[in-house]
């Protein structure tokens, strides 16, 4: 009996010792696992802290990069130049004919610091009977200049955001040297102001002209239009089309100076125009346009325009004109 009790006590003691060891080993394993997890967590946290937060600084889009590059180019551009060579089917001024046959138009301008510019425009007659008619009679000037306009002015553009588009302002002075043939033909000086909003669906343009020398007349023209991209998109469009409508107004001095009315000013030429522009490359554009103009809103001035055009003879006895042109524009 005592022997069995001793064996039983011995077995119980062994079981307790084994259980204690298992508990001890389990605690050690748990401690090891916890320590390892803590070390891994610290390492992961340190690694994450060293890496840049990509979601906080996204990469700029291509459009943003292009806009930044364009802005840098504009800032770095101290001097720029542009030139134009084209042919117009008629010599039209204020909606009436100063030449019934085609003329060649050439101009060139140099701009400094994207503000001040200087340049000139020359018109050439290409036919024998296209000399500007009137009391001075310019005569046969085929292949010779008709006018030479020397210009200087200040022009700049400001981007006002998507709502207001781009504001463009141009103030310039023109000295117009005219051809001499019979008698003395006085030169003319002009002071002009243009303001327009671009990059909008509805693009308005206001042009104010003051004749400083010939008759001191004032002419104002308001134009509205929209540029549709036909090939490409936005400013990078390869081919665009712009339809527009413009209405001119002149005071009595302006209409008298052009022989339209001696004692009456008012609404003058109304013009509907369509213009195509093909951007051949970054520095070359081909431009073509067609236009129709008439004196719609003032009967007295319409009669004056009919008489002005009719002085060319033939079938020109009307107040309206249909004309067009094509040319190449270069920019550097």
Give, region by region, the residue ranges found by the protein language model.
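Cleavable N-terminal export/targeting peptides
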Residues: 1-80
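Short glycine/proline- and aromatic-enriched beta-strand/turn motifs that initiate or cap beta-hairpins
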Residues: 49-132, 323, 329
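Short loop/turn motifs that connect adjacent beta-strands in outer-membrane beta-barrel proteins
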Residues: 69-80, 115-118, 142, 157-168, ...
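Residues on the lipid-exposed face of transmembrane beta-strands in outer-membrane beta-barrel proteins
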Residues: 85-87, 106-112, 150-156, 173, ...
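Structural signature of outer-membrane beta-barrel domains
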Residues: 88-92, 125-129, 176-180, 209-213, ...
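Outer-membrane pore/translocation modules
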Residues: 97-98, 120-223, 303, 308-322
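Detector for outer-membrane/organellar transmembrane beta-barrel domains
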Residues: 187-271, 275
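Predominantly the C-terminal beta-signal and adjacent terminal strand-loop region
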Residues: 272, 277-332
């Amino acid at each position: 009996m005592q022997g069995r009790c001793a064996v039983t006590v011995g077995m119980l003691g062994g079981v307790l010792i084994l259980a204690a060891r298992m508990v001890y080993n389990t605690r050690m394993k748990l401690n090891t696992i916890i320590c390892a997890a803590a070390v891994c967590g610290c390492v992961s946290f340190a690694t994450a802290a060293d890496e840049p937060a990509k979601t906080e600084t996204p990469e700029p889009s291509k459009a943003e990069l292009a806009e930044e590059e364009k802005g840098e180019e504009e800032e770095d551009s101290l001097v720029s130049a542009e030139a134009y060579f084209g042919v117009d089917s008629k010599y039209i001024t204020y909606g009436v004919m100063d030449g019934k046959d085609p003329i060649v138009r050439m101009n060139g301008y140099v701009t400094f610091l994207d503000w001040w510019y200087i340049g000139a425009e020359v018109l050439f007659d290409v036919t024998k009977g296209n000399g500007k008619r009137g009391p001075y009679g310019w005569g046969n000037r085929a292949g010779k200049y008709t006018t030479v306009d020397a210009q200087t002015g200040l022009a700049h553009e400001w981007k006002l955001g998507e709502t207001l588009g781009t504001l463009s302002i141009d103030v310039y002075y023109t000295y117009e040297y005219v051809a001499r043939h019979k008698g003395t033909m006085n030169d003319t000086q002009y002071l002009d102001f243009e303001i327009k909003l671009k990059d909008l669906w509805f693009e308005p343009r206001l042009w104010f002209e003051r004749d400083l020398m010939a008759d001191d007349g004032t002419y104002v023209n308001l134009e509205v239009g929209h540029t549709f991209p036909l090939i490409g998109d936005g400013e990078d469009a390869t081919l665009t089309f712009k339809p527009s409508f413009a209405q001119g107004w002149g005071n009595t001095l302006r209409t008298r100076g052009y022989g339209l009315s001696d004692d009456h000013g008012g609404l003058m030429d109304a013009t509907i125009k369509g213009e195509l522009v093909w951007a051949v490359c970054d520095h070359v554009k081909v431009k073509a346009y067609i236009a129709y103009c008439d004196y719609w809103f003032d009967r007295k001035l319409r009669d004056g325009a009919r008489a002005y055009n009719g002085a060319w003879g033939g079938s020109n006895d009307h107040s309206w004109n249909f004309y067009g042109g094509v040319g190449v524009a270069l920019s550097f």
